[in-house]
Amino acid sequence: ADGFDQLIDLTAVDYLTYAGERTLPGGLTPERFEVVTSLINHVRRERIRIRTQVSADEPTIPSLFDLWPGSEYLEREAFDMFGITFADHPDMSRVLMPEDWVGHPLRKDYAVGAIPVQFKAASNER
């Protein structure tokens, strides 16, 4: 953690349909998924963004919960939306979608429109 005392954000990206070239440092191989973590060190007034490559074959990485308990909801959201599992997370369960929901809606290969959703009409009264 090297003095980075606050987790600012954690999110994920699915590069399945990305046609551009992704350049990573140190000869790292780009994977389908990337978990992006933003941290801050208040004493040194520094910020850091960590990009972690996650394999599509086994989309699992270690949880940050022991270092930054504030990651609990953010990791659950990444699991719910992208299907990325955070090993040793205290409650790796859905947080936005119903528990019986099939699939992960922010994956690029998710079947859009496969499940009809009835939206409530907006009222004309103001």
Question: Which residue stretches match the model-derived regions?
Answer:
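Terminal low-complexity/charged segments
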Residues: 1-126
